[in-house]
Amino acid sequence: MTIFLILAPYGTFTLLMVVTSATVSLFMSAAVGLAVIAFDIVRGRAIKILGAGSVILFSALGFYLTLVDPGLSNSAVKLAVDAGVLAISLTSMAIRRPFTLQYALEVVDAETAKLPDFMKANYIITGAWTGAFLLMMIASVLMIYVPGLPLWSGLVIAFAARNSAAYFTKWYPEYRRAKFGPPAGALSRS
């Protein structure tokens, strides 16, 4: 369920971009992001870097479209979202708090969280997501600058990148558990 909640604002954005305006899609995605944050707060969990950053990203782009440039193309909006989430991911690593760390700390014991390999694993998983975000951004750039590409090609790249990162997020802790034994195995239980 955690991965669903993390991706819910982005799924909302992608779905609504097909059926309504970019502005509505952005504000609804921000609302879904706020709902996820509220859900975490109610459960006594911390506000996440990715969640808060996503709400800020969707809201800022929504206000930009409303107040500054309502004619911005859907492809440019998608590129801005992809660039924004890539920036959130890179920033989280630059400040030494990879965004996956907050989620991982909620499912491991304190002893596991203190292990140096625990932080390394979170950098690796965040790096996998960063790679996926980069591929999604490249797909958006291709859709803008190579107009002959079929629409589905960008969607396939984004879908494959996101699903690969989600799979890696589940697989990597299991791999570490099998390779290094029980202490590193507590990296993820969800």
What are these regions (language model features)?
Residues 35-45, 169-170:
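C-terminal ends of transmembrane helices
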Residues 47-59, 75-82:
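Cytoplasmic-side transmembrane-helix entry/capping segments in multi-pass membrane proteins
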Residues 89-107, 125:
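Membrane-water interface of transmembrane alpha-helices
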Residues 5-14, 31-37, 57-62, 135-140:
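Hydrophobic, membrane-inserted alpha-helices
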Residues 109-190:
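C-terminal membrane-adjacent module
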Residues 15-31:
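Structural signature of hydrophobic alpha-helical transmembrane segments
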Residues 42-46, 67-75, 148-149:
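Membrane-interface helix caps and helix-loop-helix hairpins in membrane proteins
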Residues 74-92, 157-162:
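Alpha-helical transmembrane segments
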